Amino acid sequence: AEYAGRPLMADIREEPEDEILEEMPEEMPESILLSCPPLSIWRETLLACSVVGTPGEYKPLILDDKSRLYLYRYWSYEDTLVRFIKSCGNPAESEDFRQISNLSLDLSGFGHNLQTFFPEDAGQFRFEDDKSKIFPDWQKIAALAVLRNRLVVISGSPGTGKTTTAARALALLQVLSRGPKLRIALAAPTGKAAVRLDEAMNSAYARVGLNDQQGKAMTVHRLLGTVAGSPYFRHGPGNPLPYDVIVVDEASMVDLPLMAKLVQALSPASRLILLGDRDQLASVEAGAVLGDLCGPDDAGNFFSQAFRQEIRRMTGESCLPPVPFRHLPPVSDSMVQLQKNYRFDENSGIGQLSRAVNRGDKDRVFSILNSSRCSDIAWENLPDPLGLPRLIEENLIHYFRKYMQMVINNDNPEVIFDYFER
C-alpha cells in the first residue's frame, strides 16, 4: 500500500500514443528508482493479488512475461490482434491462403495488366539528397503484395498515392479473378473520411478507365454492424463479414479495440488492406496499431528473400534496398511504404524538408530552411505576440479573400472547393 499508484503512474502510460509495446529502459532515472521497489518485488506482489493473473487466465488484470500490466479486456484485444498478425506471417498458413487465392486468380495475365494499371517506370524516382540510389516503383510492389497476402499495410505520407494504389490493386485483382465479381468493402474510422475515400477511389478507377467497382464507403462501426447499447457488433467470429476484400483508409485512427473486433470479423479467405500514415492522425483511444505495425521510419520495405525474388520475377523491379537485419518480422512482406510524392516534387524544398523531419534529422532541417535554393519554403522568425496577427494576415488573408470573393460571385462549387483545398 505504501507504493500504491506511484510506480504505475511512472511506468505505465494511461493513454499510450505510440510504441505501446516498447520495453521499459534498462536504466531508469534515479528519482524514479528511489520511489520504486525492485521489479521482482513488484511482480511477486502483483501475482499474489487475487485480481491479477497471467496470460491465459481470466482475471481483471493480466501481468505478462515482460512485466506489462493490462486490464484483461485490453490484453485480450492485443492477444487477438497478435494472433491474427502472426497467422498472416506464418509461412504455412500464408502458403495455404496463397494456394486458395491462386486457384481463384488467372495469373497468366498478371504482367500485361500490371503494366496497364501501373505504367512502366512511372513510380521510379531519385532523391536530390541521395542521387546515388534509384528507388523502385513501390506501388507495383504493393499491388503484388495485395495479390499474395491476406494482410497488406500500405503506408506513406499524404500525396504518395495510397488510395490510388489500393484502387488499382483492386482493379487488377478483379481483372485476374476467375470467379464472379469480387465483393469489396471500403471503410474508414469517421464519416468524413469515408466520404473522401469514396471520392478518391472512384476518381482512381476513372483514371484507369474502369467503372465503380465497389459499394459506398462506410465507417468501420457501420461495416461491423453497431448494436444499440452494446459494445459488441453484429459481425464477429460466428458471423463473419461477407466480403472478399476489405479496405480501411486512415487506419492510423483505428484504435486497438476496434481493430481487434475487425480482424475477428474477417472470413478465412478475405483480404484486409490497411491504408494510412504512421506519422499522422493517431487514434484517440488507446492503441497505436498502425504505428506499431509499421515500426520506426527506417524499418519499411525490407522483404524476405522469397518475396524479393517474386518481385523481380513478377514486376521486373530490381532496385530493392539491401536488408540490414538478419531476422525479419513475420509480416515484413505485407508492409509496403510508398515514398514517391505526387502532390509535390520530392526534390522540392517541402519534399526534402518533410523527409528530414520524419527522419528526425535536425541539422538537415535547418540546412534546408536556411538554403536559398529552396524557393517554395521560407524561414520566418516568430515575431512578438502583438506582431503575430499581422504576419498571419500578410501570409494568409489574401488567399481567404479570394475564396470569399468566389463564394460571393456564386462561382462553380467544384471550382470553389478545389481552391479551398489547396
Question: Where on the chain are the PLM-derived regions?
Answer:
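Hydrophobic positions on the alpha1 helix immediately C-terminal to the Walker A/P-loop
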Residues: 165, 169
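Interdomain "pre-motor" coupling segment immediately N-terminal to P-loop NTPase/helicase cores
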Residues: 31-112
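Conserved helicase motor core of P-loop NTPases
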Residues: 116, 279, 283-422
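Walker B catalytic acidic pair
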Residues: 249-250, 276
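N-terminal pre-P-loop "Q-motif" helix
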Residues: 131-148
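Short basic/glycine-enriched coil/helix segment immediately N-terminal to the Walker B
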Residues: 212, 229-244, 254-255, 260-270, ...
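Inter-Walker segment of RecA-like/P-loop motor cores
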Residues: 184-244
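Conserved lysine of the Walker
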Residues: 162
